[in-house]
Amino acid sequence: MTTLTTLLALADSRLPIGGHVHSGGVEEAVTSGLVTNLETLHAYLVRRVRTQGLVAASIAAAVHAGTLTVAAADRETDARTPAPAARTASRAQGRGLARLARRVWPGHDWTALGRAPHLPVASGAVGAVAGLTPGQTALSVVYTTMTGSATAAQRLLALDPGDVAALTFGLAPLCDDVAAAAAEEPADLSDPLLDVLAQRHSERERPLFAS
C-alpha cells in the first residue's frame, strides 16, 4: 500500500473505528438551534477545525514524531478535553482505531496504546507505523474532524449532499493550514462552547449519535 493510499484509507469515513456514530457535537448544536443551515454549519465547522481539530492533530503529530510518548500524550489529551463526555467519545474511537491497527499491522507491538487510547494518540501511533509524515497524520485528523461533523449535519438537517460536499471542498485550505500548524508543536486551545455541547449531548435522552 502506498503512502497516499494509506492516507486516503485513514481519512475514509468508512474506516471501521466507530466514527460514523459520532457527530462531533453537531447533533447538540442542531438541537440547540445553533446549526440550522449551510451557513451556520460552515461557521461551526470552521470553529471546530480551528480548535478541537488543531489540538487533536497536534497531539497526533507529536506522537508520530516521537516528541510525546503515548503515555504523556494520553495525559495531555485528557488535560485538553475538559468534558468527560468528549473524553469518552475520544477513547471509544481510539479503541476502534487501535483494534484495526492490530489487524492491519500485526507485526508491530501495540502494547503501549493499551485498550482505549485517545483517538489522537492512536492516530499518531498508526500514522508513524503506516509510513506517513507527521504532517500527513495531522491532516488526516483535521480532515476527519471536519467531515465527521459535516456528514452528521447533512443527515440531521436533510441537507443536499452536493451542497455539503461543496462546503467541505471550500474548507480544504483551512484544513491544510491547521494541519501545518499542528505539525509544529502541541496546541493548547480550548472552546468552552464545544465542551458544553458535548456534555449536554451525553445527558440527552435517545440522541441519534453517540456524541
From Swiss-Prot:
Keywords: Chaperone, Cytoplasm, Nickel insertion
Molecular function terms from GO: nickel cation binding
Subcellular location: Cytoplasm
Main subcellular localisation: cytoplasm
GO CC term, one of those recorded: cytoplasm
Similarity comment text for this entry: Belongs to the UreF family.
Subunit structure: UreD, UreF and UreG form a complex that acts as a GTP-hydrolysis-dependent molecular chaperone, activating the urease apoprotein by helping to assemble the nickel containing metallocenter of UreC. The UreE protein probably delivers the nickel.
Role of this protein: Required for maturation of urease via the functional incorporation of the urease nickel metallocenter.
UniProt name for this protein: Urease accessory protein UreF
Gene: ureF
